């Protein structure tokens, strides 16, 4: 025994007897070891106290590096005073002057940089699983575990906080007792600090993301300046550069996209329930709440409006009457409601549909405007392709019938009394889906009861079609037939015009008969 050892310096490797393959360079380096090998001790009193009970394979380079280790194994300690208090500690890496300088019984720590994990100290055998890389990274950690701190001053105030990840200069730089945080980027979660042990679950990624959070919890902030003004605010999500960048005390906001909810700011603790998804979505909202905006620049002009739903790029924005303070509007489609102004309770669905100057209106179609308050309008474009009704009065639909939109105007001569007399009105009940022919798309053998079981009044579409053929009537909107299934239908309102013609014909007959009776009685 005692082979292949290199010992250079006063008292270096003094106690070695049977240990092999050791290197001891420096005054009292590897002083106490006698029987074990594969150790490297370079520096004044490096590994001086080691006398392990197995092949310990420690490496200590630097003044007093690992000087107190006795039974610890597989440690790598490089730098003046690196790991100089460790005793029964295993699997540690300390590189840098003063790194891991106070711990005695902690295991599995990695400290790289000047004074990293300098205050860590476990009084009983503990797997710390702490990693600190960078000048003063984790310098104040005492008994916190499972921390990963990378960057100068990263997590430099942490003491007992655990399960944190801080990557970037000064990231998580003030917190002492917070746990389960993730801070990635320069100044992320810079001033967060909990006075008592707290699982805050904050995530901040990006330059200055979440830099002003103090005691807020459950926030997810990803992107440069994302949520960078939030302080005591909770359960926010901001993803995108400058998303939710102004707010301080608003909670339960979701901003996804560049500058989404950029201007939102509440001076007192407020549950906002705002959701903005898309670049510049909801970017002007200041104190409006419970808004949902989806699409690039959707709701981009909205400020104090509440309870609005906007879906589609430039929905409620991009026009001459942007939605700013309106309430309870639903705008769906590119540019839908972009001229809505500050009106309330409107529903606009379709490309550039609008309710400008109106309230409680419903618009459906493309590039079509409402005609008045409390109306339902549908169609495409304005003019002859637009149909509307006023559902607070007669609830009937109105379509443009202006003579200026019409040509080839002729008297109706074929769709009158004779046609009406050909029709049969009936009473009936609808069949269950299992009773109709199985060739029809609605057939369902399991549906043995009709959706509506009461008696109804109406006509038979096939009979209407036959009457039309008898009187050579074409292009009559009162009858329709689906091309794919052959299912026929009747539009009851279209029979008003044949009925008017029939009444006129009857009136003429009555007039003639009255004249005849008068003549006969005279």
Each predicted region: which residue ranges?
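Glycine- and small/polar-enriched repetitive beta-structure motifs of secreted/surface proteins
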Residues: 1-401
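Extracellular receptor-binding modules and their adjoining Ser/Thr/Gly/Asp/Asn-rich linkers
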Residues: 401-429, 437, 500-522
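Feature representing long, continuous alpha-helical segments
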Residues: 418, 462, 466, 497-501
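Glycine-rich, acidic and aromatic/proline-enriched surface loops and short helix-turn segments
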Residues: 422-425, 461-474
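Glycine- and aromatic-enriched periplasmic loops at the membrane-periplasm interface
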Residues: 433-442, 461-462
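Short, surface-exposed loop/helix-turn segments at secondary-structure junctions
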Residues: 439-451
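Short, contiguous acidic/charged loop-to-helix segments that flank catalytic cores in large enzymes
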Residues: 448-453, 487-491
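C-terminal intramolecular chaperone/auto-processing assembly modules
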Residues: 470, 474-522
